[in-house]
Amino acid sequence: MGDVMSEKIKIFENPKAKLVRSENYNFNFNKQSGLFMRWGKTEDDDPIVGLPEILDIEVSEICHGVNNVPCPFCYKSNVGYKGRNMSLETFKKVIDNFFFFNSEGVSMTPLTQIALGIGDIDSNPDLKDMILYARERGIIPNITINGDRLTDEWVEFFAKNLGAIAVSIYDKDISYNAIKKLTDAGMTQVNVHFMLATESLEKAYEIMNDTKTDPRLEKLNALVLLSLKQKGRGEHFTRLSQEEFTKLVEYGMSNNIRLGFDSCGQQKFIKAVEKHSNFKELEQLSEPCESGLFSTYINVEGKFFPCSFSEGTEGWEDGIDCACDDFDFLKDVWFSDRLVEWRKKLLGNCRNCPIYEV
């Protein structure tokens, strides 16, 4: 990452925590609980741009779906064995390129965690080694799965090495059984991921009710509702209106259901709770789109895009290669003209998605 940031930003780290300190950008990250706090010049100041704190990295495109039925709204349009796997060599190069040497000659990174993107749980034979390498480098690995093909061996490995795991709901029995296996193995950060659209709204209410009644979900951490981006097979789905979204949020909160939302839907969430008694607290806990501001995405080829949904869109028809030698992430990506231009669009749109109507 070069030497520029090592002079201006200090990173302190031990097995329990990572701290970043500078004049205008600071954060505390608890590696054990996942608690994260960020501030600027003062504790009341929110920095506009920082460093990459979270890395979403696609390690496989191969996905047969659940019971060999592809997901009908997959924005990547992944199908069977037609996809590619990221090699372990590429993965290591990408991770290593997020590190820099401080003034004491210690290799450090602002990354707190990586989210591994995969279809079939067993599609990439190097997945375990990738997770172990992230751990070796002091970065907490997380993953999203669909619950299919989850053997006891995978459960044991995930429980030992992941910080958190999300289970997408396609087939309820398969997903709920997977959640129970993972929580029974001692994992406390197990979430449900579910994509919201007009076509999936009824099932969203069904899952919310299940979190209160199905014993397999007794130790579930939260139900995370994801916003529809009309890309790939998702083009054929209908985005939820603000009215429908607000009703859903109100139902969840009134029934004490632990809900979470992706940053793409933050603006809708804020409108949904604007009359709530603890609005200020809810607003403080939510964050709008952070792509290219605090988070990054690397695809299966090792190429950078602001987020996975921006891949192939105008200005990002091709990404920036992050797996090459003699690479400086700060110079070649973080402060590149392309990413600076992206930030202008995102910030100029009040951190609402500049690509999709969410």
Put a short name on every predicted segment:
Residues 289-293:
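Short, small/polar residue-rich loop motifs at catalytic or cofactor-binding pockets
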Residues 62, 70-73, 288, 349, ...:
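The −1 position to Zn-ligating cysteines in a subset of zinc-ribbon hairpins
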Residues 243-280, 303, 307-358:
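C-terminal accessory region of radical SAM enzymes
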